């Protein structure tokens, strides 16, 4: 179920402060965050976030197509190692 429109998008307050601080200074640093639940806003376009996936930080460069989605969508938490092979079948 989608979030109510009257509530607006959720973004952690400290994340907005960090982005505004970088915009004022003009620097292009990576913004380290654990907030996978934050929605990507239009002011985030052009910035690079280091999003924590539970093990390490994954760099996420934000572009216009990502606006409205969550930061956690671009930092996968699970690695797929393939399905188990059938041990009865011998390959020739």
UniProtKB/Swiss-Prot annotation:
<dbReference type="InterPro" id="IPR023575">
    <property type="entry name" value="Ribosomal_uS19_SF"/>
</dbReference>
<dbReference type="Pfam" id="PF00203">
    <property type="entry name" value="Ribosomal_S19"/>
</dbReference>
<protein>
    <recommendedName>
        <fullName>Small ribosomal subunit protein uS19</fullName>
    </recommendedName>
</protein>
<dbReference type="GO" id="GO:0003735">
    <property type="term" value="F:structural constituent of ribosome"/>
</dbReference>
<dbReference type="InterPro" id="IPR002222">
    <property type="entry name" value="Ribosomal_uS19"/>
</dbReference>
<dbReference type="GO" id="GO:0005737">
    <property type="term" value="C:cytoplasm"/>
</dbReference>
<dbReference type="InterPro" id="IPR020934">
    <property type="entry name" value="Ribosomal_uS19_CS"/>
</dbReference>
<keyword id="KW-0687">Ribonucleoprotein</keyword>
<keyword id="KW-0689">Ribosomal protein</keyword>
<comment type="function">
    <text>Protein S19 forms a complex with S13 that binds strongly to the 16S ribosomal RNA.</text>
</comment>
<dbReference type="InterPro" id="IPR005732">
    <property type="entry name" value="Ribosomal_uS19_bac-type"/>
</dbReference>
<dbReference type="GO" id="GO:0019843">
    <property type="term" value="F:rRNA binding"/>
</dbReference>
<keyword id="KW-0694">RNA-binding</keyword>
<dbReference type="GO" id="GO:0015935">
    <property type="term" value="C:small ribosomal subunit"/>
</dbReference>
<comment type="similarity">
    <text>Belongs to the universal ribosomal protein uS19 family.</text>
</comment>
<dbReference type="GO" id="GO:0000028">
    <property type="term" value="P:ribosomal small subunit assembly"/>
</dbReference>
<keyword id="KW-0699">rRNA-binding</keyword>
<dbReference type="GO" id="GO:0006412">
    <property type="term" value="P:translation"/>
</dbReference>
